[in-house]
From Swiss-Prot:
SUPFAM superfamilies: Cysteine proteinases. Belongs to the peptidase C5 family. The keyword Ion transport does not apply. This is Protease. Keywords: Autocatalytic cleavage, Disulfide bond, DNA-binding, Host nucleus, Hydrolase, Late protein, Protease, Thiol protease, Virion. It is found in: Virion; Host nucleus. The gene is L3. It holds the Pfam family Peptidase_C5. Requires DNA and protease cofactor for maximal activation. Inside nascent virions, becomes partially activated by binding to the viral DNA, allowing it to cleave the cofactor that binds to the protease and fully activates it. Actin, like the viral protease cofactor, seems to act as a cofactor in the cleavage of cytokeratin 18 and of actin itself. It comes from Human adenovirus C serotype 5 (HAdV-5). Its main location: virion. The active site is at 54, 71, 122. Cleaves viral precursor proteins (pTP, pIIIa, pVI, pVII, pVIII, and pX) inside newly assembled particles giving rise to mature virions. Protease complexed to its cofactor slides along the viral DNA to specifically locate and cleave the viral precursors. Mature virions have a weakened organization compared to the unmature virions, thereby facilitating subsequent uncoating. Without maturation, the particle lacks infectivity and is unable to uncoat. Late in adenovirus infection, in the cytoplasm, may participate in the cytoskeleton destruction. Cleaves host cell cytoskeletal keratins K7 and K18.
Length: 204
């Protein structure tokens, strides 16, 4: 089941990302068009008409001309295309053309897995990343108090029994973080935890 757009918007607002948050989008996200403003969004790999498949977060720092792509499994571009039929090149081209005079931007992409293979918490991990971006836009991926709460593992080991305790701890840290910072999450904790549980996809 995972997270609904309504839930993600409410949590992101609680986390103080409102001034920069453009919204939740399906795979047709148009990219970042403002040349001077910090901006971020949560984007699904599928069309809205499908009900959605997997959430990722995009963020734009105009000062460093850097576009961040946070994808909780840390899949390669090839794997994203293989698993979700998702490509983001056109999004980057549109962002570069609109937001950078020389049409040149840097892409920084997550490459490690922080989410368990059967977890449905991708949207919640995206909210956590956007909190890091809103507070530490120069280093949102790591080396900040928010993302330091979780530990990445090599994507090649995503399904390895060896790393499942680490990935489970990540999800527990995620829930604890949201309990502390999001009144919406606290009010709907049982429902959200059930819909995003560590073994949710395995039990479907």
């Amino acid at each position: 089941m995972g997270s609904s757009e309504q839930e993600l918007k409410a949590i992101v607002k609680d986390l103080g990302c409102g001034p920069y948050f453009l919204g939740t989008y399906d795979k047709r996200f148009p990219g970042f068009v403002s040349p001077h403003k910090l901006a971020c969004a949560i984007v699904n790999t599928a069309g809205r008409e499908t009900g959605g498949v997997h959430w990722m977060a995009f963020a734009w720092n105009p000062h460093s001309k850097t576009c961040y792509l946070f994808e909780p499994f840390g899949f390669s571009d090839q794997r994203l295309k293989q698993v979700y039929q998702f490509e983001y090149e056109s999004l980057l081209r549109r962002s570069a053309i609109a937001s950078s005079p020389d049409r040149c931007i840097t892409l920084e992409k997550s490459t490690q897995s922080v989410q368990g293979p059967n977890s449905a918490a991708c949207g919640l991990f995206c909210c956590m990343f956007l909190h890091a971006f809103a507070n530490w836009p120069q280093t949102p991926m790591d080396h900040n108090p928010t993302m330091n709460l979780i530990t990445g593992v090599p994507n090649s080991m995503l399904n390895s029994p060896q790393v499942q305790p680490t990935l489970r701890r990540n999800q527990e840290q995620l829930y604890s973080f949201l309990e502390r910072h999001s009144p919406y999450f606290r009010s709907h904790s049982a429902q959200i935890r059930s819909a995003t549980s560590f073994c949710h996809l395995k039990n479907m």
